[in-house]
Curated annotation (Swiss-Prot):
GO terms for biological process: methanogenesis, from carbon dioxide; methylation; one-carbon metabolic process. This is Tetrahydromethanopterin S-methyltransferase subunit C. It is found in: Cell membrane. It catalyses: 5-methyl-5,6,7,8-tetrahydromethanopterin + coenzyme M + 2 Na(+)(in) = 5,6,7,8-tetrahydromethanopterin + methyl-coenzyme M + 2 Na(+)(out). The gene is mtrC. Keywords: Cell membrane, Membrane, Methanogenesis, Methyltransferase, One-carbon metabolism, Transferase, Translocase, Transmembrane, Transmembrane helix. It is a multi-pass membrane protein. Its main location: membrane. One of its GO terms (cellular component) is plasma membrane.
Amino acid sequence: MSHGGGGHAAELFPEDQVLAIGAVLSLIGIYVAQLFPSVSMLLGGLLAVGACVAGANTTRRVAAYGLGTGVPSIGMVSLGMGTISALAGVLIPAAFGIPVLVTPILTAVIAVAVGFIVGKLTQNPVGMKVPIIVSSMTKLSLMGALAILGFCSAFAGGFSADIIINGAISNGVIALAFIAAGMAILHPFNACIGPDESHKRTMTLAVACGLIAWLVFSIAKLDIVSTAVAAIFWLYTFGTFVKISLADACEVKYVPELPKKE
């Protein structure tokens, strides 16, 4: 059922299961990027898509309470919290001599804490009356952090401070991660919202958005194999989304080319 007129259909996939799968896949991808840098974009980039899909699913659930134009905003908040958490997770081990392999777990812990604090602040003093806002902010912060760290690690070839700083921060790639992952998290429900929204269609678009984010990073890295695989996966998934959309539509009207003269 939808809440507050937000336009959200019954769930086909339990949110906590989607969240757990997305978190596990993205964490595996982050470690693959560190331990096997030669396939960091091919496998690490692919598995980072899991965090985007899980984040999009949580956006769908919280936005159904009638956020309206807040759907894009909450996606940007997710990546804002995620960027802070990812940078802290990368830099703290280097500053305090902690083993670098704890970086992804530390990032996740920091993200959960940041998301919880921001969620509480949205209740008081901001005053949002969404019942699940604290848990949703916590989950969105976690998925944003894992998406940022996932794509940056895939591009740079690891997550140690020196690798990330030189390979993803100094060159501005982290900004690309912010926008690409942010769009993958906020866009699916924003595009599918309405009385005829379906979980299957929204999640199919979420996968397509995550895959196109991976494709963008593959192209930026000039990784031919990853680019080809990502393009094939994206074309198939987006094609599936279009077919589902046409099947769900009440009526399909094909608009001819606009006349060039009056």
